[in-house]
Amino acid sequence: MMTHDVGVRELGLIEYRAAWQAMQHFTNTRDADSGDEIWLLQHPPVFTQGQAGKAEHLLFPGEIPVVQVDRGGQVTYHGPGQLVGYLLLDVRRLGIGVRELVSRIERSLIDLLAGYDVEAVAKPDAPGVYVGGAKIASLGLRIRNGRSFHGLALNVDMDLEPFRRINPCGYAGLPMTQLRDLIGPIDISEVADRLRDHLVRQLGYAQQKTLAGGIEAYE
């Protein structure tokens, strides 16, 4: 069990490129003594294409911008009403490998959904979390010098139509779902509070601390 804390920033609605650049700066400038952070936020509409992304999976983006990024995985969509969590962790210090990190993130999401009486599962061959065959949460990470960035996206209460403009995560016709469609109206801030607790527990931190301020220092 870890004995140090993790800092959590709740950032609201942030442009994707600004958050991405801040993540990179945070990761590139941290040292062995830097604390780990979890950022919880939402993005305006954007498609992001991972390092393994293939152009054929981007069907008709229309007016929504496409950003080529340095995480793993294929194309996905972010938009308001989707809860995004960026995990800026020293995984070497945590003593876990990438697969174990993915498993713990998935378990956090599954436990979160169980709290709403939603039964969800992970798939060993397709990272993410699924409800009845439909995907409700996506994962995409990057590890640099033993430190992680990027993270997860949970569909809470959003417009799912843009997912039909892509092959989500490279799977043609993959159905997507969201928490609102499963349980009715839901406050995304409540979901964020629950998610942070589950992540802290699964990752083994002694406790969490809320960090004031935004990402301006890292841009």
From Swiss-Prot:
The keyword Nucleus does not apply. It catalyses: octanoyl-[ACP] + L-lysyl-[protein] = N(6)-octanoyl-L-lysyl-[protein] + holo-[ACP] + H(+). Residues 32-207 form the BPL/LPL catalytic domain. The active site is at residue 169. Pathway: Protein modification; protein lipoylation via endogenous pathway; protein N(6)-(lipoyl)lysine from octanoyl-[acyl-carrier-protein]: step 1/2. It is an enzyme of class 2 (transferase). The keyword rRNA-binding does not apply. GO terms for cellular component: cytoplasm. Gene3D superfamilies: Bira Bifunctional Protein, Domain 2 (3.30.930.10). PROSITE patterns: BPL_LPL_CATALYTIC, LIPB. Its EC number is 2.3.1.181. Its main location: cytoplasm. Substrate binds at residues 71-78, 138-140, 151-153. In the reaction, the free carboxyl group of octanoic acid is attached via an amide linkage to the epsilon-amino group of a specific lysine residue of lipoyl domains of lipoate-dependent enzymes. This is Octanoyltransferase. The gene is lipB.
